[in-house]
Amino acid sequence: MIIGLGVDIIEIARIKKVYNKFPWKFVNKLFSDREQKKLMTLHNPNEYISGRFAAKEAVAKAFGTGIGQVRWKDIEILTADEGYPVVNLHGEALNKAEELGVTKVYLSISHSKTSAVANAILWSD
């Protein structure tokens, strides 16, 4: 059963501007150590950062809270060996998921040259 649905779209140029101005402050605020490790392997990180930003926003919106009641790092987006995004919840996001009975978070991330979009579904068995 679907518990929540969230979607977010972001302009890659907007993320690129902030990242170029405050690279490590921005990255440390948004990403876990494992997410940062993946970021370090990329030649052009703007799509990755934008997609993950949109994904975290989409998951937070699916909870009905948005970012603010959960921290950016409470929502960790990794990549499965098969290439699809995997959501790991921590802290307040995990507490909220347990409170709502969430058993799985489905996530889709896509990019164009100018935008990144993400859609998140909170699922309960």
Swiss-Prot record:
Query: Which reaction is recorded as catalysed by this protein?
Result: apo-[ACP] + CoA = holo-[ACP] + adenosine 3',5'-bisphosphate + H(+)
Q: Which cofactor does it need?
A: Mg(2+)
User: Record's superkingdom?
Assistant: Bacteria
Name the SUPFAM superfamilies for this protein.
4'-phosphopantetheinyl transferase
Keywords assigned by UniProt, alphabetized: Cytoplasm, Fatty acid biosynthesis, Fatty acid metabolism, Lipid biosynthesis, Lipid metabolism, Magnesium, Metal-binding, Transferase
Q: What GO cellular component is one of the record's annotations?
A: cytoplasm
Q: What is its EC number?
A: 2.7.8.7
The biological process GO terms on file are: fatty acid biosynthetic process
Q: What class of enzyme is it?
A: transferase
Q: Where in the cell is it found?
A: Cytoplasm
Which Pfam families does this one have? ACPS
Q: Which residues bind Mg(2+)?
A: 8, 57
Gene Ontology MF term list: holo-[acyl-carrier-protein] synthase activity; magnesium ion binding
* Function noted in UniProt: Transfers the 4'-phosphopantetheine moiety from coenzyme A to a Ser of acyl-carrier-protein.
Task: Provide the family line.
Answer: Belongs to the P-Pant transferase superfamily. AcpS family.
- Tell me the protein's name: Holo-[acyl-carrier-protein] synthase
What is the native source organism of this protein? Natranaerobius thermophilus (strain ATCC BAA-1301 / DSM 18059 / JW/NM-WN-LF)
Where is the organism placed in the taxonomic lineage, from the top? Bacteria, Bacillati, Bacillota, Clostridia, Natranaerobiales
